[in-house]
């Protein structure tokens, strides 16, 4: 099915946003955020459009738009470590937006931002070390006077920052795992309650069917009994009528003889 005009406009704007995200932008740049907001509106309109694409295509568009939103939110964070952590949770698109792309542009932007945030973390660490007071430098170097910190110490401190970053990731992963376990427990409990309710409902329906069968049997038996009673009454009335009729005939025949 041919792409609609709305989808073509969305693809053009998405390609433009990916190109802007890959470029180096000023902190005051506002166009990309506005474009991403327009992408969200166009995506919502495309989901309810009469000639909307397949669900897989819409999901791919959603991933890319969510990636751009998450990237903009990560850029607003103050710490480079927070930016790097937020960047790791972003999921780039899996399919190129245009035919000219060999690799999805969002994946390239993801790798670029990861490298940039890692470089910022290293720069922040080096800048903090170079601005420390003289007494603190003496304590870490063990010699008198202000001397530059060795590369070995810098590497150790960088490893420490990365280790803290990894610990934070592990903590978040443990919390997510705990939430998943809690959700699984609640789901199993809900399933158990639903299963018991279904069993109770099935038992009630079975009892209702049994009672209906009993009621039907009793109704048939009562109907037969009623029919038998009516038959006996009818026969009794016929016998009485016959007896009266015969008696009248005999009475009529006997009466003249008596006269």
UniProtKB/Swiss-Prot annotation:
GO biological process terms on file: endoplasmic reticulum tubular network organization; lysosomal transport; protein catabolic process; protein transport; regulation of ER to Golgi vesicle-mediated transport; retrograde vesicle-mediated transport, Golgi to endoplasmic reticulum; secretion by cell
Coiled-coil region list: 152-231
Membrane-spanning parts: 232-252
Regions of this protein lying in the Lumenal compartment: 253-259
Keywords, sorted A to Z: Coiled coil, Endoplasmic reticulum, ER-Golgi transport, Membrane, Protein transport, Transmembrane, Transmembrane helix, Transport
Entry's family note: Belongs to the USE1 family.
Protein function: SNARE that may be involved in targeting and fusion of Golgi-derived retrograde transport vesicles with the ER.
Protein name: Vesicle transport protein USE1
């Amino acid at each position: 099915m041919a792409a609609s005009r709305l989808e073509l406009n969305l693809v053009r704007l998405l390609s433009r946003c990916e190109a802007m995200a890959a470029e180096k932008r000023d902190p005051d740049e506002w166009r990309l955020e506005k474009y991403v907001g327009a992408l969200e509106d166009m995506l919502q309109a495309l989901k309810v459009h009469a000639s909307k694409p397949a669900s897989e295509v819409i999901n791919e568009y959603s991933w890319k738009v969510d990636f751009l939103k998450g990237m903009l939110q990560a850029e607003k964070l103050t710490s480079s470590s927070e930016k790097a952590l937020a960047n790791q949770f972003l999921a780039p698109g899996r399919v190129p937006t245009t035919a000219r792309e060999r690799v999805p542009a969002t994946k390239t932007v993801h790798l670029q931002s990861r490298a940039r945030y890692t470089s910022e973390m290293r720069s922040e660490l080096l800048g903090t070390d170079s601005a420390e007071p003289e007494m603190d430098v003496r304590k870490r170097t063990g010699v008198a006077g202000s001397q530059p910190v060795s590369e070995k110490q810098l590497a150790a401190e960088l490893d420490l920052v990365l280790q803290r970053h990894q610990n934070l990731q592990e903590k978040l992963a443990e919390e997510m795992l705990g939430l998943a376990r809690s959700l699984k427990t609640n789901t199993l409990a809900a399933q158990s309650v639903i299963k018991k309710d279904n069993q109770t409902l099935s038992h009630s329906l079975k009892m209702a069917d049994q009672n209906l069968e009993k009621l039907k049997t009793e109704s048939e038996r009562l109907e037969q009994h009623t029919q038998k009673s009516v038959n006996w009454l009818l026969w009794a009335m016929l016998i009485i009528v016959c007896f009266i009729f015969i008696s009248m005939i005999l009475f009529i025949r006997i009466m003249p003889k008596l006269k």
